[in-house]
């Protein structure tokens, strides 16, 4: 637990939250500033500032709980679908303000005001191939990488 972390304080019971679900690794509770009706946050019980520093098993548990919450919010609120949002930044990009790994489960409705995250435009194929090559090259030094790495980007 990190003393100055709001989500750690919720996990420990120091701060109240409208708890929806919990298991040995995760908690799911209602967002106090919801983007849409039924907006749920899923957090690991153990503090990790972001997905890159989280224990793999904690991340998998968060993903499983987020998947379950997605089913629940679609069923309970008759949402048309969900967005799962997980931000990792130092706060200077992406508007992240809570530095405890969490996933937003955002029910989507035809009349919500969330819009789209980006305007998809087809990129130059050579730029896509170069980006893939850079990722594979970087991935070769990652101790968590699994073989075989993609061969199309070599």
Enumerate the predicted regions with their spans.
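HIT superfamily nucleotide-processing domains
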Residues: 1-154
């Amino acid at each position: 637990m990190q003393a100055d972390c709001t989500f750690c304080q919720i996990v420990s019971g120091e701060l109240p939250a409208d708890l929806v679900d919990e298991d040995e690794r995760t908690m799911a509770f209602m967002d106090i500033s919801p983007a849409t009706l039924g907006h749920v946050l899923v957090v690991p019980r153990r503090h990790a500032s972001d997905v890159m520093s989280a224990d793999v098993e904690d991340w998998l548990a968060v993903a499983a709980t987020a998947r379950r919450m997605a089913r629940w919010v679609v069923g309970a609120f008759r949402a048309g679908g969900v967005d799962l949002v997980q931000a990792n930044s130092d706060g200077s990009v992406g508007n992240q303000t809570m530095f405890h790994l969490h996933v937003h489960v955002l029910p989507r409705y035809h009349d919500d005001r969330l819009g789209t995250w980006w305007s998809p435009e087809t990129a130059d194929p050579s730029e896509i191939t170069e980006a893939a090559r850079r990722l594979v090259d970087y991935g070769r030094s990652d101790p968590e990488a699994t073989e075989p790495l993609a061969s199309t980007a070599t």
